[in-house]
Amino acid sequence: HLKNIAKKRVFNIHIQDPKVDLNHFDFIVAPEHDSLIGQNVISTKGAIHYLTENEIIENKDYLKSFIKNDERKIWTLIMGGPTRYYDYSTKNMKHIFTSLYKLLKKHDFQLVVIPSMRTPINSIHYAKEFFGDNHTVIMKVDKKAYLSALALAENIIVTCDSSSMISEAALTGKPIYIAGILPKKNDKRFQRFRNLFRELN
């Protein structure tokens, strides 16, 4: 509305898919997997986020008093939360945790589990119960712990429900693995995103 009134005095940039006619904006900056097409569309490879490499480096030592002080290298699991597409049922969490535990045991890695704002409290407690005292589960949302876990990790695993957290993990340049959950309905948009990252290696 303001754009229509002020005409050229307002330069209008929208971040992500506006879900309305693209011609209402001077520019739209949106992830490539949103499949927006137009002369005023600027596409990004991943989801747009605010993390910087400096932030990650500056917080590297934050978790050193939390994690187990041994020779094992660290794998970090970043957990999202339930969405319209993915369910965080005990069955789905058990499948992820069991697959991950086998890898940890085989390669003798230490796991650090980081929850997000969307992670159900029962999923956090289940992770603590499942992995026990030999690994580290951060029990509450803690941005510094998140940044530190990204910095310390040899490998990063992110649940499939969050394009943003996958994009943030990619900032580290480290190997990223996706913890898959069977979708409740067609998740082709998320699949496009993951396929794009796979092609980028």
Question: How would you name each of these model-derived features?
Answer:
Residues 12-16, 31, 179-180:
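Short beta-strand elements of ligand-binding domains
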Residues 21-22, 37, 85-86, 119-125, ...:
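Short, charged/polar "capping" segments at the starts of alpha-helices
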Residues 22-89:
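A nucleotide-sugar donor-handling region in carbohydrate enzymes
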Residues 73, 82-114:
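Conserved catalytic-core segment of nucleotide-activated headgroup transferases in glycan assembly
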Residues 108-143:
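Catalytic donor nucleotide-activated moiety binding site of glycosyltransferases and closely related
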Residues 146-187:
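A donor-sugar binding/catalytic signature common to diverse glycosyltransferases
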Residues 194-201:
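Leloir-type glycosyltransferase catalytic cores
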